[in-house]
């Protein structure tokens, strides 16, 4: 298959996250390969936070898709009405109208609060949900950028505490994401982050969301590279055609 055909196929989320896309290693694989190799290859189970995050992304990047998102007018997920709605509509998830309202506010804030951020996201030449494939440490990798704009790879994140974002970025694997994306797209990466909590100003009228722009530093990306390299060493050890150890026979053996 030609490169252009691969990229076009990966634009479809079902292909990207399905069997076709799984022939490529992605950032979501790196944490397992590094810390729990036996989990490599397992699909990440869906959960409500994924659905809410997906809706936030679609409102900003793919508003036409957001119109098709399943939204139900009930008070909560742990209700009989919610479960009946899923069953009646053959769905595995839906978001409530209250959740949809809150996420719409978050998306509007992201798009309109800061003129530089707005210009970056809504640039005339910006590309959204752009896939890429390439080789890293001798193995095929894939990535899908939220936004390509003004010579940057831009990734949208939400967080419960923006003041811990820099520290948590290492824990959540954003450093490895930055390395992989910068390597494959050949351009620097920055994160646009929005807090999930709507807050009231202390000294003036009005409400706000915490919002931040976090360009990636060389140090941050290099640390990500080291983690990816370690992950790929484990891949070669357990899963390559020249594997030297069986993952089924592996136990943790580490001095304290």
Name every feature range the model reports, one short phrase each.
Residues 1-142, 248-254:
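Metal-dependent nuclease catalytic cores that hydrolyze phosphodiester bonds in DNA/RNA
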Residues 100, 105, 180-256:
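Metal-dependent nuclease catalytic regions and adjoining charged, substrate-binding loops involved
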Residues 119-120, 150-153, 183-189:
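Secondary-structure boundary elements
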Residues 131-133, 152, 157-159, 194-196:
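Histidine- and/or cysteine-centered catalytic micro-motif in compact active-site loops
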Residues 143-165, 181:
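Conserved catalytic cores of phosphodiester-cleaving nucleases, focusing on short active-site segments
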Residues 162-168, 210-212:
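Short acidic, glycine/proline-rich loop/turn micro-motifs
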Residues 167-171, 221:
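Flexible, glycine- and charge-enriched loops at secondary-structure boundaries
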Residues 170-179:
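Gly/Ser/Thr-rich active-site loops/lids in small-molecule metabolic enzymes
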């Amino acid at each position: 298959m030609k490169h252009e055909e691969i990229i076009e196929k990966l634009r479809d989320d079902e292909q990207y996250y399905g069997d076709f896309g799984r022939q490529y290693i992605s950032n979501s694989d790196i944490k397992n390969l590094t810390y729990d190799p036996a989990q490599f290859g397992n699909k990440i189970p869906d959960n409500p936070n994924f659905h809410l995050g997906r809706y936030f992304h679609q409102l900003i990047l793919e508003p036409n898709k957001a119109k098709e998102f399943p939204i139900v007018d009930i008070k909560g997920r742990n209700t009989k009405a919610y479960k009946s709605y899923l069953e009646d509509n053959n769905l595995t998830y839906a978001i409530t109208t209250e959740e949809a309202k809150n996420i719409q506010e978050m998306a509007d804030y992201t798009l309109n609060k800061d003129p530089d951020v707005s210009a970056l996201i809504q640039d005339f030449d910006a590309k959204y949900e752009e896939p890429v494939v390439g080789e890293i440490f001798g193995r095929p990798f894939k990535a899908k950028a939220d936004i390509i704009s003004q010579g940057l790879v831009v990734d949208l994140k939400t967080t419960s505490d923006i003041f811990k974002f820099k520290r948590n970025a290492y824990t959540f694997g954003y450093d490895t994401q930055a390395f992989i994306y910068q390597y494959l797209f050949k351009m620097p990466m920055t994160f646009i982050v929005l807090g999930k909590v709507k807050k009231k100003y202390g000294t003036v009228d009005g409400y706000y969301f915490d919002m931040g722009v976090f360009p990636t530093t060389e140090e941050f990306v290099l640390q990500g590279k080291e983690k990816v390299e370690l992950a790929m060493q484990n891949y070669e050890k357990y899963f390559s055609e020249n594997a030297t150890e069986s993952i089924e026979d592996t136990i943790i053996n580490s001095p304290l």
